[in-house]
Amino acid sequence: MRFLASIFAGAIVAWSFYPGHWWASVVGMAILLLCLDSKPRKTRLKLTLAFALTFFAFHVQWVSVLGNDAWFGLVILCTLPWMLFALLPIDSRSKWFYLQPAALVIVLEAIRASWPWGGFPWGLLAYSQVDGPLVALSTIGGQSLVSGVVVVCAAITLKVIKFRSFSALMLLLFISICSASVSSFNSNDSVQLAAIQGNVPRVGNELSAQRAAVLNNHLRTTEQLLAEIESGLTPEPDLIVWPESGTDIDPLVPGIAADAISELASRSAAPILIGATTWYSSGSEGEGPTNSGIMWTDNGPSQIYSKNHLVPFGEYVPLRDVLAKWITRFDQIPNDFVPGEGPGVFDVSGAQIGDVICFEVAYANHIYDTINAGAQVITVQTNNATYGNTTQPEQQFAITRFRAIETQRAFLVASTSGISGLIQNDGSVTDKTKQFESAIVTGEAPLISEKTFSTKYPYWVLIIGVMFLLFTSRKNLPTRFK
């Protein structure tokens, strides 16, 4: 019965990542804690395995568009750190019951977000809370604090139901009040932004085969924006943003892409941030493609940011010599991408615009680095066409909303095929597109220079979590499973 309940708990937590279901994450974790309560290690291991496999099988099901083997492999990698949750006893009568499971989740999520190959920070409990009251705590302790408090609330819920604990109920009320008391930053300065969603000819991961199709779509949609500006229907933007891979032809190589973009930029009062794959070559450092954001003015390309956090098995192939013998589709990635160095911050008429590309928005440390480099507002250039009609675009948009609240920065998302949108620094969405349509996002975003506590001190929750576990688990760390 507990085995089935653990599977159900995993499904409930996966469901919590859908819009408006933030509370289900607390319920799912409470069910898991109930299943693990006072059970021996081997039983905890089996139940935690059932929970994590179910959770991630649902949550990252979208990766199956690349193949069921990719889906299976990712589920296993995401599940492995959760096995730490089974190492320490769960006892609802223990004085550490509220905090020890929370500390375990904080540590295992930190491991999963950074290992292996840079980690995969998807499916963190914190991201399920973007529509809930706990998300406000992200300004203090980032994703670690929010995830930890989700588990604390789950433990409190179990205490209230199992023991009719009045003190636990008061603690839950106290957490709610603390969450509600966190306020957003304000600014008198703002910037007018526009994002271009040109759309793609079809769903899938073979867009590169449709030479110039994506480029032409984004040229046409930008022409539409310029016409609306000229007619007075749309305010003049300070910056126009194309998505990742907004041009499927390298614009830094002289030719039709460079000519068309330069002609467009000459008629625009605002610079255009182009997303493109370009070729990097640097003698001793080697060469390869880069995933770049290129600031294009009427004088041509100027500032360039290249993606730092490359996607393993998407933009480069770890263990290529071994895996390529068994998985033939890695032939579609003949050259490993070259990572950029350092955050991307563009000066646009005095405004400091940070730029991140696609999955980079899920890496908290990279967003913090971008803000610490001076970013007052952040653009996200992304291409989610491969995962169209799955839950991936909505999940990534929710992560971006979380980042906006956590860092108190407005985020402009430009996607080739959706979802694009303008997210204010309080997480509210002032413009949002549907998938697989040509669309324009416009709006005003505040320019904020003040930094949240979590941005200035990003690791304090994790450090306390590790120290707490070392202190409370000295007698419980196993040399082997019983």
Regions found by a protein language model. Name each.
Residues S184-Y457:
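Soluble catalytic domains of enzymes that build or remodel membrane lipids, polysaccharides, and related
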Residues M1-V182, N389, T400-R403, S415-S417, ...:
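Membrane-embedded alpha-helical bundles of multi-pass enzymes
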